[in-house]
């Protein structure tokens, strides 16, 4: 068994001692000593879910969840139904954070959970899983690389690593589950990462869901744990359950067929390809291969490929232009007007396409707008406020409000600007 200290040292130079278990308040169920405890435990640092059939006599897989704002309960609830059904312990951090000035914040958050998991539960040290969203998705992959051979899978939502795929090249014991909302501003980044995984022959899945930059719904999160269980069988981490594998294959073939019949050809092809990768050779896999090949010969599928390629190119172009536009705005001697900034960002055209475009162009425009909104309503105003440039910060927030009403962090930044530099004319407002 690998000691706590060995695992901890591999995830950062900072060393500390924590006694987490004593802080947990138990409310029902059974703990490792067979005493009355909770299946949903909570401490100051994390929430825990333990399956009701937990028994310390065997080893259990565990999922560590890193929410980008430390919303432990929200994130844990998404995985809880599948964790109960499939037998996963889930720990969800209250200390994880994206966009932090502290580079070690997620190292500490993860190590806190890792220490507690080894101290308090009987876990399978070869079946550690990590789930992250946005910036914490990138952290999850980096931790998996450092703990290769221990981390058996990563759920990466709404963001992707810039590398790391070759650390797991041809590794059947590792699984990469990627997901993104259809209007997520990091949508293309997530797709590109799975292409790199495919090239490196890393087992992967890619799922899209309706919505913006966010955690997926419960069914997608549960699907990730189901797939991890399947990959654990295929990778030799657990004994193969032929009945469960056959049942899972049945459901996936039915789902792929349903996607095709509803006109979701690209989704059907993607699932058929995943089926072909994830199951041992059998006559039923030939069904998937033939069905996928038939779709790929259809003219409408070829047209879809061409159009999505064009839209991806446009997305990439905008992602490269946006920093240059921001640089122009920040360095102009006279603060550019809201109209001038909006024109450079092509907001009028993008807003029109987002409401009047077709099923491909509308989501593509919404993704670009979402990326622009994140920059104008959070990242850049925060930086400008730190630099004391309140006029430019307010102007950026004004343009952001043309994309969508200011909420949450955008409102907090606007209030900070107005507090430190009261507006002398009409200013943007919060919804």
Question: Which stretches of residues belong to each language-model region?
Answer:
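Alpha-helical linker/edge segments of TPR/alpha-solenoid repeat scaffolds
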Residues: 233-234, 292-319, 417-428
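Gly/Ser-rich "nucleophile elbow"/oxyanion-hole loop immediately N-terminal to the catalytic nucleophile
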Residues: 52-59, 101-134, 145-148
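Active-site machinery of serine-nucleophile hydrolases
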Residues: 62, 66-119
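C-terminal catalytic histidine-bearing segment of alpha/beta-hydrolase fold enzymes
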Residues: 191, 198-275, 287-296
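Short solvent-exposed coil/turn linkers within tandem alpha-helical repeat scaffolds
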Residues: 209-215, 275-291, 295, 331-371, ...
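The feature captures the conserved acid-bearing segment of alpha/beta-hydrolase catalytic domains
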Residues: 153-226
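Primarily recognizes the serine-hydrolase "nucleophile elbow" in alpha/beta-hydrolase
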Residues: 118-120, 126-174
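A domain-start/cap signature at the N-terminus of enzymes
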Residues: 14, 26-61, 112, 252, ...
């Amino acid at each position: 068994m690998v000691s706590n200290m060995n695992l901890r040292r591999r995830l950062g130079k900072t060393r500390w001692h924590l006694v987490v278990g004593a802080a947990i308040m138990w409310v029902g169920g059974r703990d490792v000593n067979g005493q009355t405890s909770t299946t949903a435990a909570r401490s100051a640092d994390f929430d825990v879910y333990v399956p009701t059939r937990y028994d310390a006599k065997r080893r259990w897989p565990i999922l560590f969840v890193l929410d980008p704002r430390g919303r432990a309960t929200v994130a844990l609830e998404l995985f809880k139904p599948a964790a109960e059904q499939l037998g996963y312990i889930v720990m969800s951090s209250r200390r994880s954070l994206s966009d932090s000035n502290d580079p070690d914040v997620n190292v500490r958050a993860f190590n806190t959970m890792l220490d507690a998991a080894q101290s308090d539960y009987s876990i399978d040290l070869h079946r550690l899983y990590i789930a992250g969203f946005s910036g914490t998705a990138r952290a999850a992959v980096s931790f998996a690389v450092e703990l290769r051979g221990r981390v058996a899978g990563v759920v990466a939502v709404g963001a992707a690593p810039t590398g790391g795929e070759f650390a797991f090249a041809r590794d059947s014991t590792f699984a990469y589950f990627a997901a993104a909302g259809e209007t997520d501003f990091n949508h293309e980044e997530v797709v590109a990462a799975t292409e790199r995984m495919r090239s490196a022959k890393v087992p992967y899945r890619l799922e899209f869901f309706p919505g913006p930059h966010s955690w997926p719904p419960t069914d997608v999160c549960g699907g990730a744990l189901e797939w991890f269980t399947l990959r654990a069988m295929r990778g030799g981490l657990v004994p193969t359950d032929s009945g469960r594998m056959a049942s899972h294959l049945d459901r996936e073939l039915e789902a792929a067929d349903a996607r095709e019949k509803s006109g979701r050809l690209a989704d059907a092809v993607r699932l058929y390809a995943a089926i072909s990768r994830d199951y041992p050779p059998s006559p039923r896999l030939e069904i998937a291969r033939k069905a996928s090949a038939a779709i790929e010969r259809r003219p409408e599928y070829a047209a879809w490929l061409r159009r999505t390629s064009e839209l991806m190119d446009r997305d990439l172009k905008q992602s490269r232009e946006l920093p240059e536009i921001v640089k122009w705005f920040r360095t102009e001697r006279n603060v550019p007007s809201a109209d001038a900034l909006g024109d450079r960002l092509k907001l009028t055209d993008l807003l029109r396409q987002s409401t009047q475009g077709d099923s491909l162009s509308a989501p593509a425009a919404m993704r670009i707008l979402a990326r622009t909104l994140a920059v104008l309503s959070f990242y850049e105003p925060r930086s400008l406020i730190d630099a004391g440039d309140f006029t430019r910060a307010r102007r950026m927030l004004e343009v952001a409000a043309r994309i969508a009403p200011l909420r949450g962090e955008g409102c907090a930044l606007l209030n900070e600007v107005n507090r430190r530099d009261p507006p002398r004319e009409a200013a943007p407002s919060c919804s």
